[in-house]
């Protein structure tokens, strides 16, 4: 018979530590209200630069209805790979996609900025020829996972790459124009780059085509971010025409807490993670809720408890002592066993050369993992409920992309529970998984932008306003 344990009685030192990770409803309400104030500042012309939730304009001001038709290209630019997609909208709720992943050689990624985009343009040209659409006029949208300063739908100034890219020559330049210039070297194809969006906006648009009430995109992976649909009248930093009433906003809420808004719930383990990170003092909200940080936080707690003799007292600590060694995949494996079973937890500890563990210690490990991920879900719920209440819509769908939501056995349940507790009960919502959908969203954006640009001509994309 499998053993079950009472944390308070069976591993009291662990229980005492985990109590530090249990925010109250009042705490979560306080976080929600602080988030709302920071969003209001982020949208403000006068206070934008002082906000930890800067609310960048996406310049996407149309939402799909599901009745649009046509074929388009998308380019997904991610830290580890790029993907080119041909997306066809042929009938209601029916999307056909054909794609090809391209791995950029390190010499190209580390070279001049123009080399990166020449490589991408060459890959796009080869792709459309392979798909026998090289004679077609193809609008293209870019889904971009790197930091941009957006100045228009089709103007995105590159602020920084991640560590996988070293092409410093592209920093400070317009990504869209760099790709347009590279594609101009292939006059035999007709590809029109219409704009650039981030991953969250892409996920939002992709789900919105199938579920037109979609108004939030939530990224729950190694990075933590969200986007939502705001009324243009609230977007004081927008200086364009206001005849379109909506704007997708990239919250960039990872930095929420950078000026102390979350200090009241931070504990010594949170502070250690922050101090030892590559960016101490910044991206505080992400350090509560990002997948990488959850695994690292568990590792810090376990190592501290091992040193005190509370758990795994006689086991080696050299492997688990390595920073970032316990990743989200391992964390999910630890909690995936049914109650009273610790097979997966032992398999994970085997990787750290911690073998033949006592069930009590493995139960404590699972309890720590559950505690850390539950708190992360609660804090994300504070942010999501803030967005829901700001929009004041009777029903919305929320596009969620990220392995922690999709694969963790309880994260989605906790997130749903606390979002319902925190949001105004008059507003209904539904979380919907949208795995790897940002390219489809970029294609939709390209289609809508093309339709708006060529309103007087024959449209490739049939819009329904």
Curated annotation (Swiss-Prot):
It catalyses: a D-hexose + ATP = a D-hexose 6-phosphate + ADP + H(+); D-mannose + ATP = D-mannose 6-phosphate + ADP + H(+); D-fructose + ATP = D-fructose 6-phosphate + ADP + H(+); D-glucose + ATP = D-glucose 6-phosphate + ADP + H(+). InterPro entries: ATPase_NBD, Hexokinase, Hexokinase_C, Hexokinase_N. One of its GO terms (biological process) is intracellular glucose homeostasis. GO terms for cellular component: cytosol; mitochondrion. Residues 139-165 are annotated as: Glucose-binding. Residues 198-436 are annotated as: Hexokinase large subdomain. It comes from the Eukaryota. Residues 8-447 form the Hexokinase domain. Signal peptide: none annotated. Keywords: ATP-binding, Glycolysis, Kinase, Nucleotide-binding, Transferase. Pathway: Carbohydrate metabolism; hexose metabolism; Carbohydrate degradation; glycolysis; D-glyceraldehyde 3-phosphate and glycerone phosphate from D-glucose: step 1/4. Catalyzes the phosphorylation of various hexoses to hexose 6-phosphate. This is Hexokinase type 1.
């Amino acid at each position: 018979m499998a053993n079950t344990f009472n944390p308070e009685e069976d591993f009291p030192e662990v229980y005492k530590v985990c109590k530090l990770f249990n925010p109250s409803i009042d705490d979560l309400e306080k976080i929600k209200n602080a988030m709302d104030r920071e969003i209001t500042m982020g949208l403000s012309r006068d206070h934008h630069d002082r906000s930890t939730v800067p609310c960048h304009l996406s310049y996407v001001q149309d939402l799909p209805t599901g009745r649009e038709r046509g074929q388009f290209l998308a380019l997904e630019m991610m830290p580890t790979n790029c993907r080119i997609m041909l997306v066809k909208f042929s009938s209601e709720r029916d999307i056909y996609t054909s794609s090809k992943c391209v791995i950029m050689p390190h010499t190209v990624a580390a070279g001049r900025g123009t080399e990166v985009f020449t490589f991408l343009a060459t890959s796009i040209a080869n792709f459309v020829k392979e798909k026998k659409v090289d004679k077609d006029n193809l609008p293209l949208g870019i889904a971009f996972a790197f930091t941009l300063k957006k100045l228009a739908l089709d103007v995105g100034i590159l602020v920084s790459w991640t560590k996988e890219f070293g092409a410093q020559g592209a920093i400070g330049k317009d990504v869209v124009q760099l790709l347009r210039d590279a594609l101009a070297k292939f006059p035999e194809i007709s590809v029109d780059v219409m704009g650039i969006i981030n991953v969250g906006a892409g996920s939002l648009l992709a789900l919105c085509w199938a579920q037109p009430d979609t108004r939030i995109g939530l990224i729950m992976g190694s990075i933590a971010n969200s986007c939502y649909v705001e009324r243009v009248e609230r977007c004081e930093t927008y200086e364009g025409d206001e005849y379109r009433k909506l704007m997708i906003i990239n919250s960039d809420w990872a930095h929420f807490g950078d000026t102390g808004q979350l200090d009241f719930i931070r504990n010594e383990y949170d502070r250690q993670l922050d101090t030892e990170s590559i960016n101490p003092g910044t991206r505080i909200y992400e350090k509560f809720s990002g997948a990488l940080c959850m695994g690292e936080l568990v590792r810090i707690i376990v190592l501290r408890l091992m040193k005190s003799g509370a758990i795994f007292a006689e086991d080696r600590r050299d492997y688990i002592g390595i920073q970032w060694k316990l990743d989200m995949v391992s964390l999910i494996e630890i909690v995936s066993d049914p109650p009273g079973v610790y097979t997966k937890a032992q398999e994970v500890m085997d990787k750290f050369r911690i073998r033949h563990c006592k069930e009590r210690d493995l139960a404590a490990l699972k309890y720590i993992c559950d505690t850390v991920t539950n708190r992360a879900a609660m804090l994300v719920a504070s942010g999501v409920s803030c967005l829901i209440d700001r929009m004041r819509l009777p029903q919305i769908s929320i596009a969620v992309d990220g392995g922690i939501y999709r694969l963790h056995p309880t994260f989605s349940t906790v997130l749903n529970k606390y979002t319902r507790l925190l949001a105004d009960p008059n507003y209904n919502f539904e979380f919907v998984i949208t795995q790897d959908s940002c390219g489809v969203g970029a294609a939709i954006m390209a289609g809508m932008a093309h339709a708006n640009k060529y309103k007087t001509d024959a449209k490739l994309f049939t819009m329904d306003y």
